[in-house]
Amino acid sequence: VENEETATSGPTKPEVALPDGDAPTELTTRDLVVGDGAEAKPGGVVRIHYVGVTFATGKEFDSSWERDEPFKFAVGGGRAVKGLDRGIRGMRVGGRREIVVPPRLGYGKQSPSSLIPAHSTLVFVVDLLSTTT
């Protein structure tokens, strides 16, 4: 039996404020809101809302909010960008976290769209809506 824990309050799309200074070379996370629900762990299936911007410009390149459809994936399953997958681990349902992803854990040399140049550092603000345990 899988238990799914869902956040009760409906979050709204966040504004992404770029961190100060140079782009970090390592994955960095900062909890903007600490959730009090179940913890996202490898093997669990999470539902998140997110906004992604490039560190260099602050321009939004993707947002699940615009589609009104949360992104659902298995933690550690390879469906999400590596840095995003690693960055949500330990996060709790109801939380909001800023995740700064260096190129090697993002798209690297690839440019998946005109909005994401090669070697881009990515900034995500993620709301963890639910996770299975």
Each model region followed by its residue ranges:
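Cross-family detector of peptidyl-prolyl cis-trans isomerase
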Residues: 1-133
